């Protein structure tokens, strides 16, 4: 397993890809596999950890040379495994060119913009490419997608409250497409208090917060910082609903799944993978406009919170995710390109 080098596995706070990698590791181990993970040196996932970069060089997402160094050393180190599962952007393109590399399965966690299409169109010649949602796969164009494997969680890791509190919660990055500013307007429209927990480490995130979000805060809309671990889950479990007014075709949306695992209904835009995760009228409501989301919030107490948790357990378990990837690992080892 090759994780990006920027954050530990699992991440201490925000870090969707790293949380998914941790889940895959645990699911595979339950299925009886031995797992090696190339990752950030502070990683604590239950597997053999191999790290190739000192701590001081990691932590700033997007430094190309840092990721390249991590990827090359990871591939050169992993000659003793049966198959490599790569979660980086650079790895699927350059890693298989290293001598003696095992078969490669690659998962793309982002959008298929033009640059990523060019990368994965070429990488697909020698790797099994996996999409994380039908929506993401549909956006890939002529990129050769081998399969779709949804993310999974273990609901036993998530707290559950039969009756939610009186507040709504927003969780995500502090960027325009995640919609924190929309969340405040929608919550205020129906008179429901809102708590916002969001990643705000990079300069563009801080600039957006100061310009578009901070002026809207007040007694009914509170920014509580970036939360991780139990603090994040307790906030989710105690909420009346997760408000997710995204402005983009999100490839998956892990926060929606985490919310359902806590038994908290989701009210959000019907964009990207949201319809694959949220059963409209069953575990939440999806709409297109702020007015539609506001109207949905008026009905959110009709949603059975236990049904939300059961939905996550039955449709998005670690076991289902691990099984999906096991199938791709087997296909990769049988592929004549791996010979």
For the regions a language model picked out, list residue spans one by one.
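Catalytic cores of nucleotide-sugar-dependent glycosyltransferases that transfer UDP/GDP/TDP-activated
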Residues: 1-339
């Amino acid at each position: 397993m090759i994780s990006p080098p920027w954050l530990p596995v699992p991440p201490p706070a925000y870090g969707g890809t790293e949380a998914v990698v941790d889940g895959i590791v645990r699911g595979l181990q339950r299925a009886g596999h031995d797992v090696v993970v190339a990752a950030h040196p502070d990683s604590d996932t239950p597997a053999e950890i191999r790290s190739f970069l000192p701590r001081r060089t990691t932590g700033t997402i997007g430094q190309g040379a840092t990721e390249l160094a991590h990827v090359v050393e990871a591939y050169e180190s992993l000659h003793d495994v049966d198959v490599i599962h790569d979660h980086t952007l650079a790895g699927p393109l350059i890693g298989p060119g290293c001598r003696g590399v095992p078969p490669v399965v690659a998962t793309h966690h982002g959008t298929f913009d033009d640059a990523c299409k060019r990368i994965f169109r070429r990488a697909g010649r020698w790797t099994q490419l996996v999409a994380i949602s039908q929506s993401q796969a549909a956006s890939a164009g002529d990129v050769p997608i081998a399969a779709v494997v949804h993310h999974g969680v273990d609901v036993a890791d998530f707290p559950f409250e039969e009756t939610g509190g009186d507040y709504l919660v927003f969780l995500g990055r502090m960027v325009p497409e995640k919609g924190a500013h929309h969340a405040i307007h929608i919550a205020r429209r129906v008179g429901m208090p809102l708590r916002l927990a969001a990643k705000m480490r990079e300069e563009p995130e801080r600039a957006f917060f100061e310009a578009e979000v901070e002026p809207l805060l007040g007694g009914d809309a509170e920014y509580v910082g970036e939360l991780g671990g139990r603090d994040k889950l307790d906030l989710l479990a105690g909420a009346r609903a997760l408000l997710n007014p995204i402005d983009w075709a999100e490839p998956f949306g892990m926060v929606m799944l985490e919310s359902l695992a806590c038994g908290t209904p989701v009210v959000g835009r019907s964009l990207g993978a949201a319809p694959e995760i949220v059963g409209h009228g069953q575990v939440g409501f999806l709409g297109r406009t702020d007015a539609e989301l506001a109207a949905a919030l008026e009905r959110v107490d009709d949603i059975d919170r236990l049904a939300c948790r059961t939905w996550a357990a039955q449709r998005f378990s670690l076991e289902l995710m691990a099984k999906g990837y096991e199938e791709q690992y087997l296909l990769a080892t049988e592929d004549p390109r791996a010979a």
